[in-house]
Swiss-Prot record:
The keyword Signal does not apply. Residues 1507-1651 form the VPS9 domain. The modification Phosphoserine is found at residues 459-460, 477, 486, 1329. It holds the Pfam family VPS9. Forms a heteromeric complex with ALS2CL. Interacts with ALS2CL. GO terms for biological process: behavioral fear response; endosomal transport; endosome organization; locomotory behavior; lysosomal transport; neuromuscular junction development; neuron projection morphogenesis; positive regulation of GTPase activity. Residues 427-437, 450-461 have a biased composition (Polar residues). RCC1 repeats lie at residues 59-108, 109-167, 169-218, 519-570, 572-621. InterPro entries: Alsin_GEFs/MotNeuronReg, DBL_dom_sf, DH_dom, MORN, PH-like_dom_sf, RCC1/BLIP-II, Reg_chr_condens, VPS9. This is Alsin. The modification Phosphothreonine is found at residue 504. PROSITE patterns: DH_2, RCC1_2, RCC1_3, VPS9.
């Protein structure tokens, strides 16, 4: 708090704010007094009751003064000085309120405290006359579960009730009376209840009179507005009925289910709301019945039907009657016949007046003087029944007879004059001589009665001209009472209707959140016998009802007096209604039941109001910005006054002399006194704030007047020029309206700001300056655009009549004094008028800044804001001049070109007619005119011109070496030309102008100053590299294509998108104008209604490198491209499994055709081809396997098996010989049967369908058969493609990526550079892809960017480093080696999975892996030249620790018996750990298929032998008894081995051997075997308790037992895999011997079955 207080009062001193002055009501000639006994704390708010008051100080304390009968201490009942309410100390109160005899306060935390009189429960305490001290009121919402405490923002108190406004903008009420708005019959209400009728609406403020309540409610947003229903919600009857008689139509809307139920005063507090009746009756004060009549019905404004020819007419003198529900009529009123006759006579009288020559029609005083229509209200009629209804006029008994707006011409004043003439006239007419207060009361009642005839449902009569102005297109039906229609009305009905344009500002979320809303409604309820509810009658209302005639009036504040109400609008006007006994309404001598404008001050607007018991106060802006206080209401008689005993009041509001007091910030009214809070103006701070607020409110009034008097009529004119101009004018109007609304909101917020703490830092104009700066900028831009397009000239013709008629108004509004100024000039100045306001903001903010220390943050902020507004004002002035300069240019420019070049936002910067500039090498007679606009450079020649957009224009001076001192080189995407200026100075000017224009075009912000300090820094020259959009018009390849992306010196360079008109699109990287780098390309295929789609690498405008091409036909190619063709390794998928011909090819491509080695999987035929290709056909050696087990290897020619080949069937039948077609034998050959018999000779025919044989049958001898059988199998693979010839393209691509033209030929450093580039590029591309790299992948990539350095002798450590690097490199496909491994794995799986899983292919698969190892090892040795060649030994840097005894020899040695200890370098040792785990599944499947028969025999034997318990099995296998375990340790317990024990002996060794199936590489499998032998040794040592040496005879049976118990399903496959792929140097070492033992066990188990 302290810091706040300090900053807000720094300029003033703390005792010069919130001074309290008190006047006695009725004696306004007296000077005010200071509040007796008040010390001088700054008062923020005061509230007055009948005989007491409450003060709220700046530090949140509350003081009471006056008569306080509820206090318990006698000394406190009439305190001599204000009394501190100690119960509230420490709670920090933010607002206070008083009723007649009670008070309330709201704390910072939203809690309500009440004290004072409580007879009616107004303090929310039950059964207690008085509440002496402030006590908290519990307000909780029972609708929530659990019920939540409700936080309160504002309080309002009446005589017997209190209203509270919650943080969620709902009203809570307690106390007694219908003014609570609650649906209840029991009073008092001591527990606060929600006013349900307004639940869900945003209530902005509440106010309480003695016995009535007001609420200011925010209008619903447009989308929430609903059309009025046709039928009543309660009783489902039609709201409007139409009765068709023979000669006339009667339209009645007498049905009324009022929201507020009408009750007589005596009943108001006794009854709950009765069921609404379709024919409501209103009871007057004595209980007599009279019928309500209504004058006006709103009709559908959009109706385009004319009823001139229809039968809707009405008999001239017919008046409908209705039954009166009571026999008695009020003696003080004329009867219904009298009224009817009077109305008829009066209308005839008005006709006569209208027909008199030379006389103006009578001026009608509107009830609500406002010419702007309700911009937010919904259509008030339903679409069906009402469209053809006629505007109706009231008869005296409540039935409407179709007529015209004649009732509008019927002057309300005359009706009033009839009942309210001077007392003598009244006496003469009524036959009564009474002239006292009773008579006046009667007159008021007559007045109220008469208004009720015209104000039912809160609608009112308006001046016919205002109606037409607002209604715009509202139609008049041809009336039936033609004889009564005035010529004026007929002329108006015949006039052609003009269009109306609604100037509704759009809902701006930001502004509406920060500033008070102007879209408001007023809702009232409670007692209404004085008309204080404003509904046009004197009936009470039990529930809130909207005062419709205040809709759209922008009410921002409400005040309620004893029995009158005030509404303050954003336009600084006050509407008042209710009792006017003492002239408290400020406008006439009579009361009014509908709101009317108060006539306070003709020159100045009202910005704050207060309503007392029977008077009103108005705080008014004055010329010197010091608020003036007007008083209107009760006037006490001066001494010796001998006037009659009638109440006295002011005729018009009286200005009180209070200028010497200071600046009044707030006024409060009670019963007999009123109070003002005053600020002294020490350093001009307060005066400056008042100046800002006052000028803002006046500015809003002026803008509103321009909007309603000028803009709206202009927009409704016909023939406003071209569509563009009309749109621009509408945009101007829309932006003007938005700005106007913002100013209105700001004016309203400043009014409430002046009543608060007045902190400089919370000024909206400074805190949220962008809101204002943006609105002004937008508005100025739209006006400038309108000006450039010649909008004001085009307006001249259609608007000339209107403007001439309103010339004085125009001059007055635009502040033009010179009478000779042209109309268009005035209009121009009027449209640019709002911009001047920015200077005022800057000036006032600067004034405010000078009130603070230069070092304070307030000074800095105010100073910055001031410079912001000033710089924008200057900038917008400059923009206006640019617009005028451009307009004058267009006037001189040749007409044909103007149409195509003239655009609203285009501004002229300079042109070559006044700055000599010519085209280099131009023809002698050619005319070249260069025009620089803010968005383009135009080159005009004779009647043609070319436009060069500035975003894609580069300008640079030619150097002197180029031979042109004054030359400028202009580069655009498709042109390049040189301009020669006359002088070096001209060259500099043009270069600077073009550079600045290009820079601004690229920024896209024009050159608006940056908010927050000065203008933006101007760059010397625009960037060479930039982003822009351009459509090509010349280039043959790119004609009509649009490019959007990065540019460099006139060419696409960097990321961009290129679109052709035919639908082709490229999105990706460009280099020097061509596609280069990574990109995506789409080509529509109209025939298939799909598109081809390529994603991948490009080079110099062509597909080049890795990519994926998806064809419209459904084919997908993944692989390498070169010059837009498939070239290199690639995979082509054709069709899907469900399509007609699914197939897959993976292999080498040359110039878009299959060539070299490839694998083709024909899924339909179930065949797979693995071999050589040429020109898209199988040509050369190859292998085919089928799903039925057939295997062919041999020659192919033109896709057919042709030449020598070998064919094997599933049952091992072999044919070796010549072929002529697929599976067709033709020529010499040998057919060998599975049992060894064979036929040699000539064969012809297709395999499987009968073969013709001419030859010799051989049956080999018994002894030869076993020996010769494998011969045929040994030849397998000879006619297949050699392993090293396979996948050459994959390896060549990898070498190319390393920068080598052929394997091993290149520089190592260059290879490493290429790896680094590949990693960086791929990482960058990965960032743009949707797949996000994990943290570990990112770390791997970072570690790969480090190149391993090896200096000195090669060691095991360096070897391990290389191994680690390879593992990481092969883990990421972003590395060339990783990509190679990924591709090899893909091709291997493609080859040997599915149909390729054929046991005949096992040896090919093993050879292929060995070939991979050899070729990858070559790559690794190229990258690491220090790595020794295959089979070399790396000496150990330190001998391995001894200790493990050699298993077989007993020697204490570390390794195998290699000649010297060391580490052998092999390709399999280095690369198999990386490669084999990835290839293991297909490879192991082939081993399993190949050993299928052996494995079945082995497994059957394993299952049989494992049925035996341990002891029996050990004995069966011949294990020596000394090795039998006697005891076993199970979970730490020693248990004896029994004869039934099973699966317990050597359990650790069994478990260890089972791990063999979980490893991949031979070396890992051998380690598992070695570990198993060690586990066996440990077990034996434990039982023998002594050292021993194994012999093979002892060891083999034990190991055989372990193998059996391990139950390894595919042991044969494991054995063969190790045998095929283990390092040769291991064969004769320790691991080799162990492996041989395992192999022997496998064969032994198979033979066990034979024993």
């Amino acid at each position: 708090m302290d810091s706040k207080k300090k900053s807000s009062t720094e300029a003033e001193g703390s005792k010069e704010r919130g001074l309290v002055h008190v006047w006695q009501a009725g004696s306004f000639s007296l000077t005010p007094e200071r509040l007796p006994g008040w010390g001088g704390k700054t008062v923020l708010q005061a509230a007055l009751g009948v005989r007491h008051g409450v003060l709220l100080t700046e530090d949140g304390e509350v003081y009471s003064f006056g008569t306080l009968p509820w206090k318990s201490e006698s000394a406190e009942i009439c305190p001599s000085s204000p009394l501190l309410e100690s119960a509230l100390v420490g709670h920090h109160v933010i607002t206070v309120a008083t009723g007649s005899f009670h008070s309330g306060a709201v704390t910072e935390s939203g809690v309500v405290y009440m004290w004072g009189e409580n007879a009616a429960g107004q303090c929310a305490v039950a059964n207690q006359q008085y509440v002496p001290e402030p006590s908290p009121v519990s307000i909780s919402d029972s609708e929530t579960s659990p019920s939540l405490a409700v936080r309160i923002l504002q309080l309002a108190c009446g005589e017997e009730h209190t209203l509270a406004l919650s943080l969620s903008r709902e009203i809570w009420a307690w106390g007694t009376g219908c003014q609570l708005g609650l649906i209840t019959t029991t009073f008092p209400v001591t527990k606060p209840q929600k006013v349900e009728h307004l639940a869900g609406r945003v209530v902005l403020q509440v106010a309480c009179g003695a016995f009535h309540s007001l609420a200011l409610v925010q209008c619903l947003p447009p989308q929430d507005l609903k059309p009025v229903p046709e039928r009543c919600n309660q009783c489902s009857q039609l709201l409007i009925t139409m009765t068709d008689k023979e000669d006339h139509v009667i339209i009645s809307d007498s049905h009324c289910c009022p929201l507020g139920v009408t009750l007589s005063e005596s009943q108001a507090e006794k009854h709950a709301s009765p069921a609404p009746s379709p024919h409501p009756e209103a009871l007057d004060e004595q209980g007599e019945v009279f019928e309500n009549t209504v004058v006006e019905a709103e009709l559908n404004m959009g109706s385009s039907q004319t009823t001139s020819g229809s039968a809707i007419s009405t008999q001239q003198n017919v008046v409908g009657t209705a039954e009166v529900s009571s026999a008695r009529t009020a003696p003080s009123y004329p009867d219904t016949h009298a009224v009817t006759a009077y109305l008829q006579k009066l209308s005839e009288h008005s006709m006569r007046e209208n027909h008199e020559p030379g006389e103006k029609p009578p001026q009608v005083q509107p009830l609500v003087e406002e010419a702007v229509p309700d911009l937010h209200s919904p259509p008030t009629t339903s679409t069906s029944a009402l469209n053809s209804l006629v505007v109706s006029c009231a008869s005296a008994v409540g039935v409407r007879v179709a007529a015209t707006y004649e009732a509008g011409a019927l002057s309300l004043k005359k009706v009033m004059n009839f009942y309210s003439t001077a007392p003598c006239e009244t006496a003469a007419q009524s036959g009564s001589a009474s002239t006292g207060p009773e008579s006046l009361k009667d007159l008021r009642e007559e007045q109220v009665k008469q208004e009720s005839l015209q104000g039912k449902k809160s609608s009112s009569l308006m001046d016919i001209r205002e109606e037409e102005l607002e209604g715009g297109s509202r139609r008049l039906s041809l009336p039936g009472l033609l004889s009564q229609v005035s010529p004026r009305l007929l002329r108006k009905a015949a006039r052609v209707k003009t269009r109306t344009v609604v100037l509704t500002p759009t809902y701006s979320g930001e502004a509406d959140a920060l500033l008070p809303s102007l879209r408001t409604e007023v809702w009232t309820w409670g007692k209404g016998k004085e008309g204080q509810l404003g509904h046009g009658d004197v009936l009470p209302r039990l529930q809130p009802l909207c005062v419709k005639c205040l809709d759209g009036k922008e009410v921002i504040h409400l005040e309620a007096g004893g029995s009158h109400s005030l509404a303050l609008t954003a336009k600084s006007q006050v509407y008042s209604w209710g009792s006017n006994t003492f002239g408290q309404l400020g406008h006439s001598e009579f009361p009014t039941t509908v709101p009317r404008l108060s006539k306070v001050s003709s020159e100045n607007g009202v910005w704050s109001v207060a309503a007392g018991q029977d008077y009103s106060l108005f705080l008014v802006d004055t010329e010197d910005f010091q608020p003036g206080l007007y008083y209107s209401g009760r006037q006490d008689r001066a001494e010796g006054d001998t006037l009659p005993e009638n109440p006295s009041g002011t005729k018009t509001p009286v200005l009180l002399s209070c200028s010497k007091l200071g600046y009044i910030s707030r006024v409060t009214a009670g019963k007999d006194s009123y109070l003002a809070l005053v600020d002294k103006n020490i350093m001009g701070y307060i005066a400056s704030l008042h100046e800002l607020a006052s000028t803002e409110r006046r500015f809003y009034s002026k803008l509103s007047e321009i909007k309603s008097q000028i803009l709206r009529p202009l927009l409704s004119l016909e023939n406003l020029g071209t569509v563009t101009t009309v749109q621009l004018l509408q945009e101007v109007a829309s932006r003007f309206s938005k700005l106007c609304y913002l100013i209105g909101q700001h004016g309203a917020s400043l009014s409430s700001y002046l009543q608060g703490m007045k902190e400089a830092s919370s000024l909206v104009i400074m805190k949220h300056s962008s809101l204002f700066l943006d609105s002004y900028t937008e508005y100025c831009t739209s006006v400038s655009n309108f000006l450039v397009m010649g909008g004001f000239q085009l307006l001249a013709k259609p608007a000339i009549d209107f403007l001439n008629k309103n010339q004085e108004l125009l001059q007055d509004l635009s502040e033009v004094n010179d009478e000779n100024t042209q109309l268009m000039e005035i209009l121009n100045m009027l449209f640019f008028l709002p911009i001047r306001r920015l200077h005022n903001y800057a000036k006032v903010l600067l004034k405010l800044a000078t009130c603070f220390e230069v070092t304070s943050p307030e000074y800095q902020k105010l100073q910055d804001s001031s410079s912001c507004y000033e710089s924008l004002a200057l900038h917008l002035g400059k923009k206006r001049k640019e617009a005028e300069y451009t307009l004058s240019f267009w006037k001189t420019f040749p007409g044909k070109m103007t149409d195509s070049l003239r655009k609203p936002e285009r501004r002229l910067l300079c042109e070559s007619s006044n700055r000599a500039l010519s085209l280099q090498h131009a023809g002698r007679f050619s005319v070249n005119w260069f025009i620089l606009f803010n968005d383009a450079l135009v080159h005009a020649q004779f009647s043609t011109h070319h436009v060069f957009p500035l975003a894609t224009l580069w300008a640079e001076p030619l150097s002197e070496e180029a031979g042109s001192v004054n030359g400028l080189k202009i580069t655009t995407p498709e042109e390049q030309f040189t301009l020669i200026s006359s002088t070096p100075q001209e060259k500099t000017k043009w270069l600077r102008a073009i550079s600045q224009a290009v820079d601004q075009a690229l920024r896209g912000t024009s050159d608006f100053p940056l908010y927050g300090g000065g203008s933006s820094v101007q760059r010397q020259e625009p960037p060479i590299s930039r982003s822009a959009k351009y459509t090509f018009y010349k280039d043959t390849r790119l004609k009509d294509a649009t490019y959007d992306g990065r540019w460099l010196s006139g060419k696409p360079h960097g990321r961009g998108v290129l679109k052709w008109p035919d639908g082709k699109m490229y999105s990706g990287m460009f280099r020097n104008g061509l596609e280069d780098g990574y990109g995506e390309y789409r080509i529509p295929n109209k025939a298939l209604n799909k598109e081809d789609h390529y994603v991948g690498h490009w080079k110099e405008g062509k597909m080049c490198g890795q990519g994926v091409y998806s064809y419209a036909s459904g084919e997908v190619f993944e692989g390498c491209f070169q010059d837009n063709m498939r070239h290199g390794h690639g995979l082509l998928r054709s069709g899907k499994l469900t399509s007609s011909s699914p197939s897959m090819f993976i292999g080498q491509w040359v110039m878009d055709k299959k060539a070299g080695y490839g694998v083709f999987d024909d899924i339909t035929r179930g065949e797979k081809y693995m071999g050589m290709w040429q020109d898209d056909v199988c040509q050369g050696n190859g292998v085919v396997v089928t799903q039925f087990g057939l295997y062919y290897e041999g020659n192919f020619h033109l896709n057919k098996m042709m030449g020598n080949g070998v064919l094997l069937s599933e049952d091992d039948t072999i044919y070796e010989g010549e072929f002529s077609d697929d599976w067709t034998l033709s020529g010499k050959g040998t057919l060998t049967m599975p049992h060894g018999d064979y036929i040699e000779g000539y064969f012809s025919g297709e395999w499987g369908s009968g073969i013709k044989i001419t030859g010799t049958y051989f049956k080999p001898s018994l002894y030869e058969s076993d020996k010769d059988k494998p011969k045929a199998f040994r030849k397998l693979g000879n006619l297949a493609v050699a392993a090293d010839e396979k996948w050459r393209a994959v390896f060549e691509e990898c070498w190319r990526q390393l920068g080598c033209e052929s394997p091993g030929q290149g520089e190592v450093w260059k290879a490493w550079d290429n790896i680094a580039v590949a990693l960086t590029t791929n990482r960058r591309q990965h960032k743009d892809s949707p797949e996000i790299l994990s943290r570990s992948q990112t770390q791997t990539l970072e570690s790969l960017e480090y190149i391993p350095q090896h200096i000195g002798a090669f060691s095991v450590e360096k070897y391990d480093d290389i191994k680690k690097y390879l593992i990481k490199a092969c883990d990421t496909p972003l590395h060339p080696l990783g990509r190679l491994v990924e591709t090899l794995v893909a091709v291997y799986r493609m080859t040997y999975v599915g149909v390729g899983a054929n046991r005949r292919l096992l040896q090919e698969a093993v050879k292929e892996i060995k070939s991979y190892l050899k070729r990858i090892f070559q790559l690794v040795r190229f990258l690491f030249p220090e790595l020794p060649e295959e089979g070399s030994t790396i000496p150990l840097s330190a001998p391995l620790p001894t200790g493990r005894r050699s298993f077989c020899t007993g020697k204490s040695d570390s390794r195998s018996e290699s000649p010297e200890p060391g580490y052998v370098v092999t390709s399999s040792g280095l690369l198999l750990p990386v490669l084999l785990p990835r290839l293991y599944p297909p490879l192991f499947m082939l081993y399993a298929l190949d050993n299928d028969r052996e494995e079945d025999i082995y497994w059957e034997c394993v299952l049989r032998l494992n049925k035996q318990p341990d002891i029996a099995l050990l004995g069966f296998l011949g294990v020596q008894k000394k090795f039998w375990p006697a005891t076993l340790s199970i979970l730490g317990e020693s248990k004896k081995v029994l004869s039934t024990t099973k699966d317990a002996c050597f359990a650790s060794a069994v478990e260890c051997l089972q791990q063999i199936s979980t490893t991949f590489t031979p070396s890992d499998k051998l380690k598992v075997i070695q570990q198993t032998f060690e586990e066996i040794s440990q077990s034996v040592l434990a039982s023998l308790q002594e050292d021993f040496l194994w012999s093979m005879d002892d060891l083999f049976p034990v190991f055989l037992y372990v193998v059996l118990r391990a139950r390894i399903r595919n042991l044969g496959s494991e054995v063969h895999l190790i045998e095929d792929l283990m390092d040769p140097f291991l064969q004769h070492g320790e691991q080799g011997i162990m492996f041989t033992t395992l192999k022997a066990c496998y064969f032994q188990i198979q033979r066990e079955k034979l024993n």
